[in-house]
Structures are given as C-alpha cells and as structure tokens.
Amino acid sequence: MKVIASSLRKGNVVEKDGRLYVILSAENIHPGKGTPVTQLDMRRITDGVKVSERYRTTEQVERAFVEDREHTFLYSDGEGFHFMNPESYEQVAVPEDVIGDQAAYLQEGMAVMLSLHNGVPLAIELPQRVTLEVTETEPVTKGQTASSSYKPATLSNGVRTQVPPHITAGTRVVIMTADGSYVERAKD
C-alpha cells in the first residue's frame, strides 16, 4: 500500500527495492527555503543494517502489510526473547536487536504487541506504563521542598531515573516505558 512519506512513524515497515525496513525514527524537516523533506532512519530486517533516507514529504512510499498481534512475554535466554500468542499458544523467539533498549522493561507475563510480517517479528510495542520498585535512592534532605526538585533513583530493572524527594527505597512507582520518566507512586 502506497502512503505519503510524511505519514510514516516509528515502528512502521516499508518496502524498498524488494527489501523490508522497519522505521527507527521519522522526522519531518521544513527548511526556511526549499522543499520540506521527511528524514527516515531505518533498519533492514534481513541483516540489521541501518540506513538513512530522505524523501519529499509528498513522495509515495510502499508500506508493507504488517500484522500486529498481542503476545505474552515468557522469558529470555541466549537465543533471544520468547513470547507466546495467548490464543494459539504458539511461541515466537524475538532477536535482541528487535527489542533493543526496551528489554529492561520486559516483565514475565507482560502483554505486548508484536508486529509480524509473514510470521517474522519486526517490532515490539510495550505498554505505555510499567510498575517497578525503587531499589536505591538518596535520602531526602530536610528543607529541600522549596522548589520542585527530583533526585536520582535506581529501579529494580537497573534503569536510573529521577523521582520526587518523598520516594524512598522499596517504594513501587509507575514509569513511562518510552523515556523511563517517573509518573506516580503505584497504587497497590
């Protein structure tokens, strides 16, 4: 299916010269003088090579048919990350390069959306928010509440983030998976 380049987003799959590419980032650039362009950073699915392409924003690009299906994360090992389709109980092994830095947020039993093209996993979409425990953070300093300040904290998955001063070690917090930012204290 042909679409205009400016409508492409991260995670979309395009076909170019008979090969499939997953879009890592898409940026619409509008220079003061000249034609607006869409800058695409893509990864070739067959061998993982990263390429950058520029298209005029109105240029037609072939978008590949990709099936998005819900899967449940089971475990990870040397072969990759293993997911199960909850309807058919079919298991899929996803290579580490497809998951990338999102691997830190995967938890056993987590429901994710896997993008598949002819049964081959291309991309993964995690839930927007995930609940994690703070394992380490600095103690609060009295009188530091005059301005809204945040302090560094290490989460149970090893990711470092900024949390409000009232959060202590052992507290469960809600984190955005897109950027690792603090949302709120968990309500459980």
UniProtKB/Swiss-Prot annotation:
Polar residues: bias regions: 142-160
GO biological process, one term: peptide biosynthetic process
InterPro entries (UniProt xref): Elong-fact-P_C (IPR015365), NA-bd_OB-fold (IPR012340), Rib_uL2_dom2 (IPR014722), Transl_elong_fac_P/YeiP (IPR020599), Transl_elong_KOW-like (IPR013185), Transl_elong_P/YeiP_cen (IPR001059), Transl_elong_P/YeiP_CS (IPR013852), Transl_elongation_fac_P (IPR011768)
Family annotation (CDD domains): S1_EF-P_repeat_1 (cd04470), S1_EF-P_repeat_2 (cd05794)
Protein name: Elongation factor P
Keywords for the protein's UniProt record, in alphabetical order: Cytoplasm, Elongation factor, Protein biosynthesis
UniProt keyword annotation of Cytoplasm present: yes
The UniProt record lists the keyword Calcium: no
Naturally occurring in which organism (per UniProt): Methylobacterium nodulans (strain LMG 21967 / CNCM I-2342 / ORS 2060)
One GO CC annotation: cytoplasm
Alphabetical list of PROSITE patterns matching this protein: EFP
Residue span of region Disordered: 139-163
GO MF annotation, one: translation elongation factor activity
Stretches assigned to coiled coil: none
Purpose: Involved in peptide bond synthesis. Stimulates efficient translation and peptide-bond synthesis on native or reconstituted 70S ribosomes in vitro. Probably functions indirectly by altering the affinity of the ribosome for aminoacyl-tRNA, thus increasing their reactivity as acceptors for peptidyl transferase.
Compartments, as annotated in UniProt: Cytoplasm
Similarity field: Belongs to the elongation factor P family.
